[in-house]
């Protein structure tokens, strides 16, 4: 279906092209339709606002139809087209993610087997197919690792039994991925502060251990 925009000076501002089967056969027999007559094929597309006959199509004037209805139909058709394209695109991308190289490996193996006519060529074809299969297995394994990985956690707030929102004892932040234990061993620190405290505590314990080892070495020469 084709739509054309005409200026206001013409007798019609919208036209469409439809098939003969969609209209009555009498439309092509110079019969009057809404005060318009079908023109000769040579004069087709030279005048506006009339019914034209050309090959297997006829052009019908929209001068008797409200523009609001026409625009609404066009808008609905465009929305349906975009929705269909998105569905097909998402389906194709999901299939490509599951088996990204299966089609390429299969086509390569088949083409090599068709062109081989001697035993040496057959051996080369099988060798290339084996390489392609191993490459496909490695790629599939790589994609499977991505799909089975744990999703990223989001920050959240915790409401205490008394109705107050829990906050970090160090930075006073209320949003965190998880609560971690600090000096009080009561999970009073947010995730960043808890990780920093753990690293600092680990360094302090390492220094204490090294100092204790030095004292032991001095006492036992």
UniProtKB/Swiss-Prot annotation:
Entry annotated with the keyword Methyltransferase: no
Pfam families for this protein: GATA
Membrane-crossing segments per the record: none
Coiled-coil features, chain-numbered ranges: none
Subcellular localization, as worded in the UniProt entry: Cytoplasm; Nucleus
Zinc finger (GATA-type): 168-193
Molecular function in Gene Ontology: sequence-specific DNA binding; zinc ion binding
Top-level taxon of origin: Eukaryota
Comp. bias intervals (Polar residues): 101-110
A Gene Ontology BP annotation from the UniProt entry: regulation of DNA-templated transcription
More info: Present with 2100 molecules/cell in log phase SD medium.
Name of the protein in its database record: Pre-rRNA-processing protein SRD1
Taxonomic classification: Eukaryota, Fungi, Dikarya, Ascomycota, Saccharomycotina
